[in-house]
From Swiss-Prot:
Residues involved in ATP binding: 30-37
Function recorded in the entry: The RecF protein is involved in DNA metabolism; it is required for DNA replication and normal SOS inducibility. RecF binds preferentially to single-stranded, linear DNA. It also seems to bind ATP.
Gene Ontology molecular function: ATP binding; single-stranded DNA binding
Cross-referenced SUPFAM superfamilies: P-loop containing nucleoside triphosphate hydrolases
Protein name: DNA replication and repair protein RecF
Subcellular location: Cytoplasm
HAMAP family: RecF
Organism field: Leifsonia xyli subsp. xyli (strain CTCB07)
Keyword ATP-binding: yes
Disulfide feature: none
């Protein structure tokens, strides 16, 4: 899979932009603040349904405009698609494929990309919510149906929290507790599906992560992903490397465990007016050489871990997708690497059908990734060099 053309209207600092892409490596060069990251952010949005920089879509609409449009022409072998999303200030977003309307959450069915940016260091050093979003975005790319599951879980969670607060205020009336049981059943069904999907994903990422870390760092530091589930009260720490492939069974039947966990915290939840266990509060422990990467890994090791996670994601998508490789996006990555690691990364990504790279300094990028270079100046596309 690759992008052949990108059109932007009122997206970030671009009033309009038309960009042609080649197969293989495409390098965007420009000083900081010129708009090169905005270009790749727009493509990342099409597959992740969100920005890697901001939580609100509104920030991506150009100041003074009411809507922004991202339109990309996608090619897979002989098949060509026109994929479009419209971001609206005062209404729901809209999406199209070949001019036919679709739900925005269906976009990952048609375009797949993996983006790595400096902000991804937060995967290792940031809060649990960052790691949950990483897993869920990858889940949706692998199976877009899960977008609806996640959205429905969040809706049910919100309703349940509202009911818990109401029950607390009315001193736990019997009729409200009965209604809570109904919401519990829905929360259990959706939550167990999401937990199991995350566990399966972590298991599948295990081997690609080890290989990717070695390819970008040259070290055998054995990175691992260990689930920390609030419904279990503990996380798996089995020293057997193969145990990651059987994470789900380590917790027993997820729905039953979740049900028992909810029962165990029922009165605490009523006192606090908050759902205390479930996938919305889970975390993933990133481990390097048997130690938590957060707090123990150096800056370079943390950077390598985050980059390896994204490369492992790309490898997993390329193995499973019938549409070929995801488009690999490396946003301002090479500036953080020494020359040896730049060479290693260039070798690692060389086999992908298309790689999009941004850099402030042309010389930071190995020559084999700079054959098709586009310069960006003040939100304007300069002819390829």
């Amino acid at each position: 899979m690759r992008v052949t053309h990108l059109s932007l209207t009122d997206f970030r600092n671009y009033g309009t932009a038309e960009v042609h892409f080649e197969a293989g490596a495409n390098l965007f060069v420009g000083r900081n603040g010129q708009g090169k990251t905005n270009l790749v952010e727009s493509l990342g949005y099409l597959s992740a349904l969100g920005s890697h920089r901001v939580s609100s879509d509104q920030a991506m609409i150009r100041q003074g405009a009411e809507l922004a449009v991202v339109r990309a022409r996608i090619q897979h072998e002989a098949r060509e698609l026109l994929v479009e999303v419209q971001l609206n200030r005062g209404a729901a977003n809209r999406a199209q494929v070949n001019r036919a309307a679709i739900k925005p959450r269906e976009l990952p069915r048609y375009f797949s990309s993996v983006l790595f940016a400096p902000e991804d260091l937060a995967l290792v050093r940031g809060e649990p919510g960052v790691r949950r979003r990483f897993l869920d975005q990858l889940l949706i790319q692998r199976n877009p149906r899960l977008s609806a599951v996640i959205a429905e879980y969040e809706r049910v969670l919100k309703q349940r929290n509202t009911l818990l607060k109401s029950a607390r205020a009315s001193r736990f009336r019997e009729d409200q507790l009965g209604t809570l049981d109904i919401w519990d059943d829905r929360l259990l069904t959706l939550g167990a599906e999401l937990i199991n999907a995350r566990l399966d994903l972590m298991a599948r990422l295990s081997n690609p992560l080890v290989a990717a870390y070695r390819s970008v760092a040259g070290d055998d530091h054995h990175p691992r992903l260990l689930p920390q589930l609030t419904i279990s009260g503990a996380h798996v720490e089995d020293e057997d490397d193969d145990s990651v492939a059987d994470m789900t069974s380590a917790f027993g039947d997820t729905t039953d465990v979740f049900r028992q966990a909810l029962a165990g915290v029922r009165w605490k939840e009523l006192e606090r007016g908050l759902t205390l266990v479930g996938p919305h509060r889970d975390d993933v422990l990133f481990e390097l050489n048997g130690l938590p990467a957060k707090g123990y890994a150096s800056h370079g090791e943390s950077w390598s871990f985050a980059l390896a996670l994204k490369l492992a994601s790309a490898e997993l998508l390329r193995r499973e997708s019938v549409t070929g490789d995801p488009v690999l996006i490396l946003d301002d990555v090479f500036a953080e690497l020494d020359w040896a690691r730049r060479r290693m990364l260039a070798t690692t990504v060389a086999g992908y059908e298309q790689v999009l790279i941004t850099a402030a300094v042309y010389e930071d990028v190995p020559a084999e990734l700079a054959a098709h270079t586009i310069r960006i100046e003040a939100g304007a596309i300069v002819e390829p060099s």
